[in-house]
Amino acid sequence: MAAVKSAAGARDYRASRRRRAGLTFTFLAVALCVVMVLSAGLGQYNIPINQVVASVGRRLGLAPENPTMQLADSTLWNIRFPRVLLGVLVGAALGTSGAVMQSVFGNPLAEPGVIGVSSGAAVGACLSIVLNLQFFGIFTTPAFAFVGALAATALVYFLSRSSGRAKVLSMILTGIAVTAVANAIIAFLMFIADTTSRDQIVFWQMGSLNGSTWKAVASVWPVILIGLVACFVMASSLDVLALGERAAQHSGVNVERLRAVSIAATALLTGAAVAYAGIIAFIGLIIPHLLRMILGPSNRVLLPASALGGALLIALSDLGARTLVPFADLPIGIFTALVGGPTFFVLLRRSLGQGGGAS
């Protein structure tokens, strides 16, 4: 009798989890679509929502052309839509990479910056700005930032290896050291830079989607797609890793290879996002942490949910950055920090209150 009740309870629990996951995904997807449409319509030049939808219909050949809407169409397709889509890609990349890092390190407070990817990207961007490099035209700074992110991540991984494997603690400590050196290089570059370059560096480090183009979207989406697919494929293995390294190895998981591929995928995602949007804090920390509290630890559910949640938060932050102050385009990093900082504090206090803090 007890076994029957236990089995029934387990079925009810799984059904409850599935319902919660379904509701969460539905909410995130609908909210993201609504915010994307609002973000496309709102700004210094407001475009009614029905005209935004009609413009998409005209582009798809589902609605007749309207000569009186040429200005609105030009604004939407040359400025608003590229920015909105780039923001969605950046948010999805940061949210997913944060969830992967928290799984790899077994710490819900981990984020992509732990492995030095953000600081490496900042060094690359600062070099291109200070030296006024123009090898790839408008893509020079993003290219240098992306290469810097990958280089810093590779440096952290290989320096932390010992006896053929990289331990979690070694990677964290090596990441701290590499980040410190990167910050020193950034400070030196800002010291020798002229006023214009210094202002560009400061604005880039705050994070912004200003100046987004279809070329930027076209160049970044394949990289982010590859990173997302790699992370989603690894989700089941990351769930096994949560049981512990020894248990994962006994289950047939190559822990060292899983960790290396996870870090490489995270470097791709974060490097691509930071290259075009600058450093945007807290997305990779707060979104996975909140969704884990709602959905549980299963990465098969958590990773795609983190992608949607990250995209939603970036879209909301960019909307606020463009509309809260008239005739100004504020850095996105201001809004993510304003949301992420207090949220992080609340989560930390809740964790300590439940006995999760170190004594």
Describe these PLM feature segments.
Residues 2-359:
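Alpha-helical transmembrane segments in inner-membrane proteins
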